[in-house]
Amino acid sequence: MMNSPIQAVIFDWAGTIVDFGSFAPTSIFVEAFKQGFDFEISLAEAREPMGLGKWQHIEAVGKLPTVAQRWQKQFGRPMQASDIDAIYAAFMPLQIAKVADHAAPIPHSLEVVEQIRSRGIKIGSCSGYPRQVMDVLIAAAADYGYRPDYVVATDDLAQGGRPAPFMALKNVIELGVTDVRACVKVDDALPGIEEGHNAGMWTVGLLLSGNEAGLTLEEYQHADDQTLQAARERAQAKLQQAKPHYLIDTVADLPAVLAQIEQRLLAGERP
């Protein structure tokens, strides 16, 4: 089989390749708010800004009108940076302790990765997780057989994380990619798709395996068509804001999209 005009596919982690439904970070955000301040947030509120670095994520949750109102009522003042620091301090050990429990690959992701590699395409990756958490997740995912060629954590770069392009571009540099147009960014969350656009890459959003659908693997596997379509539409309404080039259900559907991108590249198109 001929080598591909695509040089690299850069995957997000939770909700994209591992952790169907992206439950590791969301459930722990709820727990960290509870542990840090005895303050309740819902899973839906925890999911809202998913894809950002985790400190920025806590800050964004605090700015949600529903959360800000309850915080003001409970504490008599708005959330401030020292509060975010305290919640983040509670978040980190919880996440480090539990992230390995959510390292199982999303169905068909390993086969898709191997299929992509067989075409001579590099496998990059980046995450909203900080390095301390990623080191645990990388090892756990490797035990399942997932070993990307490069990994960038959200706090690796002084310039910052998503939605800026820096983590994606760090993959470009380290993987020796010669043209960002030959890269595809795959993500289940809005900031990750925006990151791909900002890096000049093709972007693919995932509707059913990630944060926006919020389905467990079991719910997904046993859902009827109506339930799946409702989840699909819910995720699409959010992800479409970033105007991804493609929207698919899960990484299992990625090979067909990559074939289309290859044809577009060969025809001289750019993202």
Curated annotation (Swiss-Prot):
Involved in phosphonate degradation. It holds the Pfam family Hydrolase. GO terms for biological process: DNA repair; organic phosphonate catabolic process. Its EC number is 3.11.1.1. InterPro entries: HAD-like_hydrolase_sf, HAD-like_sf, HAD-SF_hydro_IA, HAD_sf, PGP-like_dom2, Phosphonoacetald_hydro. It comes from Vibrio cholerae serotype O1 (strain ATCC 39315 / El Tor Inaba N16961). Keywords: Hydrolase, Magnesium, Metal-binding, Schiff base. It is an enzyme of class 3 (hydrolase). GO terms for cellular component: cytosol. Its cofactor is Mg(2+). Belongs to the HAD-like hydrolase superfamily. PhnX family. Mg(2+) binds at D12, A14, D188. The active site is at D12 (nucleophile), K54 (schiff-base intermediate with substrate). NCBIfam families: HAD-SF-IA-v3, phosphonatase. This is Phosphonoacetaldehyde hydrolase. Binds 1 Mg(2+) ion per subunit. One of its GO terms (molecular function) is magnesium ion binding. Homodimer. It catalyses: phosphonoacetaldehyde + H2O = acetaldehyde + phosphate + H(+). Gene3D superfamilies: HAD superfamily/HAD-like, Putative phosphatase, domain 2. SUPFAM superfamilies: HAD-like.
